[in-house]
Every structure is written in structure tokens, then in C-alpha cells.
A protein has these predicted regions:
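Glycine-rich, aromatic-bearing surface loops/beta-hairpins
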Residues: 78-141
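Catalytic cores of large soluble enzymes that bind and process phosphate-bearing ligands
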Residues: 1, 5, 45-49, 78-82, ...
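Conserved phosphate- and dinucleotide-binding cores of soluble alpha/beta proteins
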Residues: 4, 64-66, 136-141
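Long, hydrophobic N-terminal alpha-helical segment
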Residues: 1-46
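A phosphate-binding glycine/aspartate-rich beta-alpha loop in the early core of alpha/beta enzymes
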Residues: 39-71
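Amphipathic alpha-helical interface surfaces
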Residues: 13, 49-53, 86, 90
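Structural motif
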Residues: 24-27, 41-42, 64-73, 101-103, ...
Length: 141
């Protein structure tokens, strides 16, 4: 048992996050995303939505402050400017964790799949809101 560690953060997940370096990507993806296709480790957060996962992850995971866009979201096909409730929850968690407004960039769905190829690891949530897939670039502490 550890003090001051979010209860969703398991030992294997903390180990993965610790091994990530500055600039590495973490995928925070919904239940429909084909995370296992990429060959990166996949941490199962079934039953956890995007907001809950973001609150846990961002309690220990610094976002990159040296780039304009440390978070990318998958666009909704045919409605690229639409912001889902899941994205709103991620935005709230990111802003709170970083103590500043965090810009979430929009990426077309197929471009997002390509952008996810070098991901270090995925956190596969049980999020039911479609297109709730995000890439988070790790910063420094």
C-alpha cells in the first residue's frame, strides 16, 4: 500500500509511467479503440470513464509544457469541432492537474490512428462515449 497514490494507479501502470521519457506518448482510449493492434502495453481500465482515468493518470503524469499541444483528441467523423462530454472531463482534469489551461488539439480519425503508432502504452478505458480517444505527451517534473 502507498500513501497519496490514486487507487486506480496499479503497480504495473505506475512502472510504465515511470519508464516513459519526456515526449513519449500515452494513449488514453475508449472501449472501441483497437489498442492491442499496436503492440504497446495495454492497461485495462474497464469500468472507468475518461474523466476518472484522467484524474488518476494526471495526478502523477506531467503533460509536456514545451509544446503547444500536449494532448490530442480523435475528431468525430463529420463533426470535427464537436466536443464530447468525455473531452470536457479530460479538459477539466488536465487544467486542474497542470494549473493552467491545456490546449487539446483535434486530429482526424485516420490520422489519429497513425499518430498513435509510437505510443509507449495505452490505458484502455470503459468509456462509452464514441471518439473518446486521446494521446498525452509526457512532460518533465
Amino acid at each position: 500500500m502507498l500513501k497519496n497514490v490514486h487507487p486506480l494507479l496499479s503497480g504495473p501502470l505506475l512502472s510504465l509511467l515511470d519508464r516513459m521519457g519526456h515526449g513519449d506518448l500515452l494513449g488514453l482510449v475508449d472501449r472501441n479503440f483497437p489498442a492491442h493492434r499496436y503492440g504497446a502495453p495495454v492497461i485495462d481500465f474497464r469500468g472507468v470513464d475518461t474523466g476518472q482515468a484522467a484524474d488518476a493518470l494526471l495526478s502523477v503524469f506531467p503533460l509536456d509544457g514545451f509544446v503547444d499541444e500536449a494532448v490530442h483528441r480523435m475528431e468525430i467523423d463529420g463533426s470535427p469541432d464537436e466536443i464530447t462530454v468525455a473531452t470536457e472531463r479530460l479538459q477539466k482534469a488536465a487544467d486542474a492537474a497542470e494549473g493552467r489551461p491545456v490546449r487539446i488539439a483535434s486530429v482526424e480519425r485516420f490520422a489519429f490512428y497513425e499518430m498513435a503508432k509510437p505510443v509507449f502504452a495505452f490505458v484502455h478505458t470503459g468509456e462509452t462515449v464514441p471518439y473518446s480517444c486521446y494521446l498525452l505527451r509526457k512532460g518533465v517534473v
